[in-house]
Amino acid sequence: MKNLNVNKNSVISRLINNYLLSHKFTIFFALIMMIISAGATGLHAWLVQPALDEVLIKGNKEMLLLIPIAIIIVTLCKGLATYAHSFQMSKVAHSVIAKLQTQMFEKLMYLNLNYFNDSKSGNLISRLINDTYYLRLAIVKSVTAVIKDILVIVFLLGNMFYQSWSLTLFAFFAFPLAIWPIKKIGKSIRKITYEIQNEIAKFSNVLAESIKGIRQVKAYNREEYEKKRAFATINFIKKFFIRSAFVSNRLSPLMEFIGSLAVAVSIYAGGVFVLNESMSTGQFMSFLVSLLLAYQPVKALGNLNISVQEGLAGAERIFSLLDTSLEKLEKHENSKNIKLKGNIKFSDVNFSYTGQKVLNNINLSIECGKKAAFVGLSGSGKSTLINLLLRFYDNYSGEISIDQKDIKSLSLFDLRENISLITQETLLFNESILDNIRYGNMSCSDKKIEEIAEISGVSKFANELPGKLNTIVGESGIKLSGGQRQRIAIARALIKNAPILIMDEATSSLDNLIEKEIQLALDELMKDKTTIIIAHRLSTIQNADVIFTLEKGSIESKGTHEFLLKNSAVYKKLQLQEDANAH
């Protein structure tokens, strides 16, 4: 609820200045169409008077022909104008929402990892989809209602005053009574909608987790648990929607009552005027038709506040994302197309996360083209070193340099363009094998990808698939085995051909047999590259040029496999654990 203190006027002003004004010509054209549509409604009401007075009472045969023709022409003009302004305003709304969604997605792509660590994916997805949905409705309804419905009321009021100004004052005496409850209901709806959107975000998160982790759910027989978790959120959403309906639906009977008062007073007073011959029957009926036609736009303006408040609640959540602190944004300077060799050095590097020391006075160097491995117990800081080298986090002390260049002096694009990363969990997109490999180098030709697929061993299994390299892998590569996904990851890194290669427990999820099968592909990948390996199994790093052992965020020892077996307590412990697990 903390974001509800955002100033409503500032949100509206921002929407108008930053998003709606760029469509001012389209909105102006729609406004002209609204004037025509509203004027046609007023003309419909006015035509009742000559239809009664001139045709039915006076028997004017010329008017008998003209009035039906006039009604057809007015109706046609109204229909065309209504279509035009409705289409144009929908186009504006969709354009505004597309711009907001583009800005939000761009913002998400450039936020640092800290932001994602503190956020739930369902909440972020909800802002992009649900909040923009509410705002889209608000833009279409509010602009159309505020302009068109007010214009309709103005034209109808004009006809009512034309027929009888005194009767008009009688008819509208009760409408000011509706202002306070409309305002009160609107505020309540805004608060409830904000809660609904938060709960929908939670539900999106539960849904995403349950579907993504469906194998774990089934393996642990947790279907009932996930049902309870989802049902609890669904019930919260249901309660908020019921509250919203309870509050918003109060407005309808209120407007019905006020409308009936206006009609009752008008019929009584108008009847008196007609009986006193101060008003003709045609004038009274024209007045009454105008009053009845005015009821719907007046009611729509009352309900409009509900749509506006729902849209504002969505806009607040959208802008809270767009206004994320600059401290949480990665700084993407322009690329200078720097090509690095791969001499890496950490000098007095310290790093804390959420107040806890993670790395303590790290000093190390890795020569260009050498293979370095990092081992240690879980939580010793191995992956954190990689995160700092890739500048996923910048709030460390000390210096990290590549080729004697402080990595903070490099643009993020240049730095990361010189590094290939293979992780334990291979991210594959729901596209073809070919496109998933191309992700490493978007300008690469199909022929080059086919060559890389052969080298990495991807072709070995792809050729057995119906679509070969054009086979769709499924969401997160679900249609492939772990070894097959890892081969694609290797191919992706090969095609990027960066001078620095990082393998963060890249083969830890594979069994020994599969690991040996892809070792040739890995050897090809590591050739002539500075390679950093975060190791799970010591057997995979015995040929490393240097191995660093980490303990509680500090380097305990470094050396070759043989040296560490004799001199490192941490390394000995890890070797004993591996030997025990092998038996």
What are these language model-derived features?
Residues 1-41, 56-67, 85-89, 93, ...:
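Membrane-integrated ABC transporters
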Residues 11-12, 20, 85, 89-90, ...:
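Juxtamembrane loop-to-helix connectors within ABC transporter transmembrane domains
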Residues 337-583:
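ABC-type nucleotide-binding domain
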Residues 22, 26-37, 69-77, 141-195, ...:
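Transmembrane helices of ABC transporter permease
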Residues 24, 113-114, 130-139, 143, ...:
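An intracellular "coupling" helix at the cytosolic face of ABC transporter transmembrane type-1 domains
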Residues 2-6, 94, 102-126, 130-134, ...:
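Short intracellular "coupling" helices and adjacent cytoplasmic loop segments at the cytosolic face
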Residues 17, 25-46, 67, 71, ...:
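Alpha-helical segments in transporter systems
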